[in-house]
Amino acid sequence: MRILITGAAGFIGRALAAQLAADDRHQVAILVRDHYRSQPLPQVLIDQKDRLLVVFADLRDYQNTARAVRAVRPDLVYHLAAGGISDPYLDVNAAIEQNLYGTLNLLRAAFEQEMDSHPRQLVAVRTPGELSAMNPYAASKAAAWQFCAMYARTRGWPISGVMPFQTYGPGQHDRHLVSGAMAAALAGEDFPMTEGSQEKDWIYIDDVVDGLIAVGEAELPPGTNVELGTGTLNSVADIVSRVYDVTGKGGGPLFGALPSRAGEVQAHAADVETARALIGWQASISLDEGLARYCNHMQDQAA
């Protein structure tokens, strides 16, 4: 199967690309921005460079995007590219251009332009932040999905949505909670944070990748949305405490050192029953096992 992945240099995208590239059944292409012509890709992609086709395009440019899609002629597209994932101050115009217009350009390039064949499925990767849309990133992602759903309903384009919940694990930037807490804990330092009362559904990166692959292999009705999570809620305070327990290096969380964000959704777990019914998938890595794996990985990287 010919597979095109946008956002393959990101946290989830690189893990997905590496796993798919290792499967001899697939020909995997990754669409990345032009600046990767002069700077290295993430190491996990370099390790698979002989099994990856790299195409360069800026999704904000329809002509370049259409050219890249024609070059690959994918059977399956995973759309993970997004701007501002960890930037709460992302400019509104930048969010709209990258996340809304970029998605629309990819959809049109995949299904509207004349080609010998069109993808049998495009998987749009969403964010649980869409449920509250507290920043331009989340709001623009929510708007992009509404257009995906509209095209699926009105034109029958085979677009599916996948919403991974709070993903953590190797490759995540330390601006995120678990990775930042893990780095501080391994250094024996304290970790300033909010009171940590928010409850979230935490899922390890390997489970997310397996779920994305299961969606890509399924025959789903256009407009279907699948949530990837464990179905279990754990508070932010509990997660950070567990991080310090698993590292055992000293230091600790400083609860209440930072203010909570107003309006944040307090609790929402993934709909795991629907995921199991639609794609035959469920998370298999417990929270304690996932944190232990992540800790071991970071220690190995530092050795």
Segments the model singles out, each with a brief description of its role:
Residues 117-127, 147-170:
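Conserved beta-loop-beta element that borders a ligand/cofactor-binding pocket
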Residues 142, 167-179, 189, 205-206, ...:
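Glycine/proline-rich active-site loop of Rossmann-fold NAD(P)-dependent oxidoreductases
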Residues 205, 237, 258-282, 286-289, ...:
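Conserved C-terminal active-site "lid" loop/helix of NAD(P)H-dependent oxidoreductases
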Residues 77-79, 83, 97, 101-138, ...:
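Conserved Rossmann-fold NAD(P)-dependent oxidoreductase catalytic core, especially the SDR/UDP-sugar
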Residues 23, 287-303:
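Amphipathic terminal alpha-helices
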Residues 1-76:
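N-terminal Rossmann/SDR dinucleotide-binding element
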Residues 139, 161, 172-183, 194-214, ...:
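Substrate-positioning beta->alpha
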Residues 30, 195, 223-226, 234-241, ...:
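C-terminal "lid/loop" region of Rossmann-like NAD(P)-dependent oxidoreductases
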